[in-house]
């Protein structure tokens, strides 16, 4: 896709592991940015064997928002979490970042 192309949809892949302290605020911010676009989107949360309350918080997002899809794993493996997320994407345009390092300005620029 060249820089002059437009797109009708996108997927965001976010691997997570023990992120209960930042997950709710971060996903709400990401959803808010995405919902301001006129483009269909999905957010793939690839849970990575968390031992805290991350998995339950992610399930709540999936249940309350049709644009959020949760993939669960019982063991931590960052590479596998990314791979599972990419394989689940239904859209051609894919954005991926870590929940604790994402940038709102980067996401807005991508969209």
Predicted regions: what they are:
Residues 9-11, 42:
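Cell-envelope/extracellular polymer assembly enzymes that use nucleotide-activated donors
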Residues 19-22, 50, 78:
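Donor nucleotide-sugar binding loop of glycosyltransferases
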Residues 19-33:
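Short, well-formed alpha-helical segments that are part of the catalytic scaffolds
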Residues 22-25, 52-60:
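Acidic helix N-cap motif at the loop->helix transition within catalytic regions
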Residues 30, 106-111:
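A short, amphipathic alpha-helix embedded in the catalytic core of nucleotide-handling enzymes
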Residues 41-44, 55-88:
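Conserved donor nucleotide-binding strand/loop of the catalytic core
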Residues 47-55, 101:
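A conserved acidic beta->alpha catalytic loop
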Residues 94:
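Short aromatic/hydrophobic "clamp" motif used to bind/position activated sugar donors
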